[in-house]
Amino acid sequence: LYANRTDTEGDTRVTEFAFADGHAVTSSERDVLVVDQPYANHNGGAIAFGPDGYLYIALGDGGSGGDPHGNGQSLSTLLGKLLRIDPRPTGGAAYGIPPDNPFVGQDGARPEIWAYGLRNPWRFSFDRETGDLWIGDVGQNAWEEIDMEPAGSSGGRNYGWNVLEGSHPYAGGSTGGMTPPVYEYANGDGTCSVTGGYVYRGSAIRVLDGWYVFADYCLGHLEAIRLRADGSVRHKRLIATVGAITSFGQDPTGEVYAMSRSGGVYRLTSL
């Protein structure tokens, strides 16, 4: 069992626990990865095993505002990145590096990095049917973005922060080789912060199959998008309204659940 938490010093700590009789064995806790955080915000937070069996870890840019240290575009730091590691290596190391990670062997680059140019990708998930990777990345003040990386990607994508916020200029600089979001929306009219979700693969709402369900923390509505074959996006606002959505979950049958800051857990059963 793996967990990602912010410790009492404000740093990111990914830990491993033995699992027995349906419970984590707290005495077995082992640090897998510890990352110093310079500020108290933008810690990221999501972790998930990919279809390839490796552990993916989302880390924000380190916080403050505007990425003052340029972490998003720097390959020398883990901040502002999506990482990909082997949490159970041989030889006594805390974790291993998959040999096909995109920056293995590159001078000055951290080999753990799978993707970069992210501001605060605190929620991401894999499509259980296709293996596609979906990332909800919180913007600075103007734009919220959703990124999608197709299954089978070789990694190394640059999603633009802080040169770009979404697909729009932010700090300036060359945008060559950057990957734009598949969907973005402007902040305003009650929106403030995207909460990434899951591609719906359940049976309760057949017409939602293949749609990526997400939310905005401030707006409260559940939203859904679906990519067309030509790369354009269909969008719909779902009926469900839940305030302060902080996370989503998906059960073994593909049904989607939303969690709110108030402590509620809600299953999506209709549009």
Segments the model singles out, each with a brief description of its role:
Residues 89, 150-177:
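Mobile, glycine-enriched helix-loop/loop "lid" segments at the mouths of ligand-binding/catalytic clefts
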Residues 244-247:
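Repeated scaffold domains used in trafficking and secretory/extracellular systems
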Residues 146:
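Acidic/polar, glycine-anchored loop/turn motif associated with catalytic or activation segments
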Residues 1-66, 123-126, 131-139, 143, ...:
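Acidic, Gly/Ser/Thr-rich repeat motifs that build Ca2+-stabilized beta-propeller blades
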Residues 68-75:
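Short turn/helix-capping motifs enriched in Asx and small/polar residues
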Residues 17-38, 75-120, 130, 172-189, ...:
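Blade-edge beta-strand/turn elements of extracellular beta-propeller
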Residues 59-61, 86, 165:
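Short, small-residue-rich loop/turn micro-motifs
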